[in-house]
Amino acid sequence: MILYEYPFNERIRTLLRLEDLFERFTFFVAQEDAREHHVALTTLFEISEVAGRADLKSDLMKELERQRQTLAPFRGNPGIEQNALEAVLGEIEQTLANLAQMQGKTGQHLIDNEWLASIRSRAVIPGGTCKFDLPSYYAWQQWPAEQRRQDIAKWSMPLLPLRDAAMIVLRLARESGQASKVMAMQGSYQQMLSGRTYQLMQVRVPPELRVIPEASANKYMLWVRFTAQDGDVRPRAVDIDVPFQLTLCNL
């Protein structure tokens, strides 16, 4: 099944963007080639931009504290797996402590590093990081892969508490949902929400159908419409019945 996720608010949208960027960063920083480390570094700049939203850190701390207060009363409950509960609570408490230790504006260490700032300003220009534009950056790219990797890890470290917090919130949101099998008649599906608030919608479709879900929602109803993309033309609506799995997640 192919999984598509649709955020219902700006906070979850931001966390999904951070998750995607950190996954890309983790992949490329683990590689050996200097060009792959260039992608890792420019991705780190993107992470800094997204994570630099003024209220993101405080939002994450409030949400983690809310989850901690929700889960803590289950300690000692015989119907709850205590080892799993303690692991989650320990993870939340450690991440809260790490967030509290973050000082200043998120990503400021990248801005204050004049060398990285020069790379960042050139990286937004098409072809702007050629060796004649940034000879010092080109020289760094000739260093051993492990040395480059250590540098990038050092620059990313101040952002890791935000990554950890985002991953916890997204994981708890995803685990809150229950998948149901539904059918989009002639490619279209709608469902009443009865005013209940959700943070995230997941749509899983069989890959062999080669359809693409498009979704929208308000506090009363959600819509899922399936399209197909063929060659160079824009996706078009399909008129076949599409079986899929729908999950609504609510923290």
Swiss-Prot record:
NCBIfam families cross-referenced by the UniProt entry: PRK05287.1-4 (NF003656)
Keywords (A to Z) from UniProt: Cell cycle, Cell division, Cytoplasm, Septation
Gene: zapD
Protein name: Cell division protein ZapD
Function: Cell division factor that enhances FtsZ-ring assembly. Directly interacts with FtsZ and promotes bundling of FtsZ protofilaments, with a reduction in FtsZ GTPase activity.
HAMAP family, per database record: ZapD (MF_01092)
UniProt-annotated location(s): Cytoplasm
GO biological process, alphabetically ordered: division septum assembly; FtsZ-dependent cytokinesis
Pfam families recorded: ZapD (PF07072)
Subunit structure: Interacts with FtsZ.
Family to which the UniProt record says this protein belongs: Belongs to the ZapD family.
Gene Ontology cellular component annotations, sorted alphabetically: cell division site; cytoplasm
Keyword Cell division applies: yes
Source organism, top-level taxon: Bacteria
